Amino acid sequence: MPLFTTLSIIHNAGIIHRGISPENIIVTTDCELKLTGFCISSIRTSNTGLSPEFYSGYTAPEQYSSLEWQGTWTDVYALAAVLYRILTGCMPLDAYTRTKNDTMVEACRVNPRIPQHISRVLSRAMRVRGEERIQTVSELVTALFEQHTTHMEHPKGSTQTIPIQ
């Protein structure tokens, strides 16, 4: 959760990271996660001849166009893509490719042990159109961790253990 908290704090300060990827998440010897590479894209492009750095599979679609707005939803896309990679073991499809032909496979289809609820949240957080995406890290956290009291999803073939009284 510290990574989610860090992103919420920087977003509340008006800062968008624009480069979240496994390469920019460092695990310390104390097993803490550190996010690096802040604002690299804005530094690289402001009054220079440099192009922004894109992270295939993690860069949000709107980052490929100078005409589209970027915001907290841009980082939500990248964070969800990192979670997708962790949970499935597969690289997410490149967003630029997805804008032309979206063939992204849901996480639960890649790894059947992923609950459908989590898979749906990741799909919503990685929608191609920014306005259709989960907008903030706090919304992402709420969606990922909300409890389903009326219907708990269990993987096929699983059984429920009921304590003996």
Per-range role (PLM):
Residues 3-15:
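Protein kinase catalytic-loop region centered on the HRD/HxD motif
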Residues 16, 21-22, 26:
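Canonical protein kinase catalytic loop motif
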Residues 24-37:
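Conserved protein kinase catalytic/activation segment
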Residues 43-45, 91:
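Conserved protein kinase catalytic core
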Residues 48-57:
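Activation loop
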Residues 57-149, 153:
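C-terminal lobe helix-coil module of Hanks-type protein kinase domains
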Residues 151-165:
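Regulatory extensions appended to serine/threonine kinase catalytic cores
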